[in-house]
Amino acid sequence: MNFTEDHLDVHEDMEDYLQSKIALLKSSKRKVINNKILKYLPNKFKDITFNHSNKKNTEQLELENLSSDDYIIKALPNNKFIMISKGFEMNFDTNKLMGEHNVLNIAAAFAAFRILNLTFTDYQNVVRSFRGLPHRIEWVREINNINFYNDSKATNVASTVAALEVFRSKNVFLIAGGDSKKLPLAPLKKYLTKNVAHLFLIGQDALKIQNFFKNLDMLKIFMCDDLANAVNEAFNLAKSGDIILEFNGTEIKEM
């Protein structure tokens, strides 16, 4: 289980959303939980946890605080990883799953495999062959060395941040809009000023998003009629090496 700001168009506030998550845990026999959200949960819900580490050396990890049901994953160069738990260490590699969020997904999947008593070979085969879900930072095509990605399943701010982190060294042309679900947009500001120079807006909350970000230096905002218009505008402005990232951060109901 993970927990980020979302669905505030349905829930009264984040506490109400959290309680709905806790209700799911109450009906679950086993629980795979992101270690970072344990502080929000009653102790009785601690079961199997996963997290990732950015520390340069595995020796710096606080292994003495781990139990055999705690898993920490660390990304290494060339799509290689190391999974560490108490009395356990495993090196493996994966296919080209992009982004820090997928590192966490890999750790969560491993914890689930352990619950099901599946073998490491089973796990390794799945991780190596899995290319990601459709519409989640899904590569679409490349034209003139401009790459198009479809991230239409990313319907909240946290998902947007995850995608922009993947392309933090690139110049991104971002297409967004739709229903913002009453989510706060402020966390996006620092990411939009890093590597997004052009923002193309469509959908019902396009004007709201434009008004929120219109004073950001260096950010050019374009109001577009629909997806086709936004893609064409972005492509006309993009240069070799740029990224056009379609639809993330909000829920597009106009599709």
Question: What residue spans do the PLM features occupy?
Answer:
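Acidic, Mg2+-coordinating active-site environments of NTP-dependent enzymes
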Residues: N2-F148, Q210-F213, M218-K220
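ATP-dependent carboxylate-amine ligase
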Residues: A111-T121, N125-H135, W139-M255
